[in-house]
Amino acid sequence: TAINVGKKTVTVRELDTDKTYEESYDKLILSPGAKPIRPRLPGMDSPHVFTLRTVEDTFRIHEAASRQKPKTAVVVGGGFIGVEMAENLAALGIAVTLVEKQTQLLSQLDADMASLVHAHMKSKGIQLLLGKSVAGFEDKTSGIVTNIGADEPILSDMVILSIGVLPDSSLAADAGLALGFKNSIAVNDCMQTSNPDIYAVGDAAEITHSASGQKALISLAGPANKQGRIAADHICGVAHTYKGSAASSVLKVFDLTVASTGINERTAGAAGVDYEKIVLSPVSHASYYPGGTVMTIKLLFERESDRILGAQIVGSDGVDKRIDVIATAMQAGITAIGLKDLDLAYAPPYSSAKDPVNMAGFMAENIADGLVKQFHYEDIADLRCRENVILLDTRTPAEYARGHAEGFRNIPLDDLRERLAELD
């Protein structure tokens, strides 16, 4: 419950007996983790409102679901936990509404990639309310009401709060240790705090994002485990250092796998990085072999240096393999064009002779050599303002009906010659 830096002791409270005592240390490792954000909203103390962070929290939610047999639930927050919670509740036959303050789910993705996740979750029956803020909760005899500003309140049987976490750094702060980004515990590359005899690792420790070079909070299990090893090594006199994290992550969302590494467009733009992007939609393995599915890959790289900044992949099969290859390439200093030379395993059930990662490298090389000039969806807005531009969609009528950009005229490619007069 407390650290006495001068005496090099910690105060310990036994949870079973409430007894307290002091324990001395030579070296101390802090791994307090993170705590869920609980906003000060009306109705937060309702027994129908749950937060999810620990294993014990899952037991409480599962017990409540088993006992109360809820038919409806509201999930507040569209990060990892919120999306996973929505899927698991839906698997129990519960109708789920997911409310997210931002205009998209999963902030590690760019909006175009997140839209693929939105469409898939909607197809699974999840109602998404994006760009909406929760104002509070009210208990009713028929359940709990979630108030969303001026919007219609939502009546449900339970509410799951998963709006993010904060580093649990109060113990460190009370001991006078220096804090860093978002009140995380500041550490060096040996995981030492401002007191060299005290180390900090995990979700409460400030680290360097290896793709951006900026200080960051990365609440992922992989980095936390590596930090623990670095701290233990340093205590034992082994001179290893932590190299930072690219925040590589992977997430199951119903039938999709969503993965990312490095930074996204939003972060690159905010940092003033001059970047290029590639979007491709290859098949997970050889197209002539049954069972292949399309994945969408987005690769960001620095325009001048060709340094890979990050990648995002959404698909059904083979997504984790490709994101790991790109994450490894980033750490090894391989450039975007260098992806074309990677010698990756191939057999028709697993990949294609030109692996999707190789294809991204080919595209980067084509851009660098001036063989291709890219045109992105967001560039359409500028074209709409030009009088001499006709926006033409040459897909089939069925493809056009499934979805099209506003302002595009549909003339199928096979009919284009006979209908040229319509373009005057």
Regions found by a protein language model. Give the residues of each.
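A Rossmann-like FAD-binding core segment of flavoenzymes
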Residues: 1-12, 16, 23, 91-189
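Hydrophobic beta-strand scaffold positions of dinucleotide-using enzymes
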Residues: 29, 160, 172, 391-393
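Positively charged, proline/Ser/Thr-rich regional signature most characteristic
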Residues: 379-424
